[in-house]
C-alpha cells in the first residue's frame, strides 16, 4: 500500500476586491504559518486567511477517519457545540497567541451569533509587535450540516488616527 502524499493543504486565492487570501485545511499548518508570518514577514499586521478543518476532538472520536464522523456532530448538537466552544477558548485561541508570540492577547471583544443554520463566535483584540499596533479578528463558524469548522483570521494595521 502506498502512503498518501503529504502535500501542503493550503491555497492562495484572490478575491474580487483584489485581496489575497490563504485558505488552510490543516490546523498545524495554519499555526505554523502564523508563527513564521510574525517572524519573517513585514505584513504580519495585514493578514487574512481562513481555515477549514475538523476539530481535534471530532477526529479523535472518529479515530482520525473523517469518513467515520457522526452525522450528529454539527451546530444542532449541544455536546458538539459545548466541546467546540471549549476547544476554541482553551486551545485554539491559546495556540494562536503562542504562534504570534503575543501572550498578552486576551480576545476580550467576544460575541456569539446563533441561528438555525450556524453558530458564529467572534473574537477580537489589539496587539503590538515590532512597535506596530494592529487589530486581530477571529471568527469561528460551525454549521448545521456537518462537523467542519470555518475559521476566519484577519489582522489590520492600526494607525495613530484609528487608535484615538
From Swiss-Prot:
Principal location listed in the UniProt entry: membrane
Disulphide bridges: none
Top-rank taxon, per record: Eukaryota
Membrane topology: Peripheral membrane protein
Keywords attached to this entry: Cell membrane, Membrane
Signal peptide: none
GO terms under cellular component: plasma membrane
Locations listed in the record: Cell membrane
A GO BP annotation: energy reserve metabolic process
Membrane among keywords: yes
Protein's job: Involved in the control of energetic metabolism and significantly contribute to cell fitness, especially under respiratory growth conditions.
Protein family: Belongs to the RGI1 family.
Record protein name field: Respiratory growth induced protein 1
Biological source species: Vanderwaltozyma polyspora (strain ATCC 22028 / DSM 70294 / BCRC 21397 / CBS 2163 / NBRC 10782 / NRRL Y-8283 / UCD 57-17) (Kluyveromyces polysporus)
Amino acid at each position: 500500500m502506498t502512503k498518501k502524499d503529504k502535500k501542503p493543504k493550503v491555497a492562495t486565492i484572490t478575491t474580487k476586491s483584489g485581496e489575497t487570501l490563504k485558505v488552510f485545511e490543516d490546523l498545524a499548518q495554519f499555526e505554523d504559518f502564523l508563527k513564521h508570518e510574525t517572524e519573517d514577514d513585514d505584513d504580519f499586521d495585514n493578514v487574512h486567511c481562513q481555515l477549514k478543518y475538523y476539530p481535534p476532538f471530532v477526529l479523535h472520536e472518529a479515530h482520525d477517519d473523517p469518513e467515520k464522523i457522526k452525522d450528529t456532530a454539527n451546530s444542532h448538537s449541544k455536546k458538539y457545540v459545548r466541546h467546540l466552544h471549549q476547544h476554541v477558548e482553551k486551545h485554539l485561541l491559546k495556540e494562536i497567541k503562542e504562534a504570534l508570540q503575543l501572550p498578552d492577547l486576551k480576545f476580550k471583544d467576544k460575541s456569539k451569533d446563533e441561528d438555525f443554520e450556524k453558530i458564529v463566535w467572534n473574537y477580537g483584540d489589539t496587539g503590538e509587535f515590532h512597535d506596530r499596533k494592529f487589530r486581530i479578528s477571529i471568527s469561528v463558524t460551525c454549521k448545521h450540516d456537518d462537523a467542519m469548522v470555518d475559521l476566519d483570521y484577519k489582522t489590520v494595521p492600526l494607525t495613530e488616527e484609528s487608535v484615538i
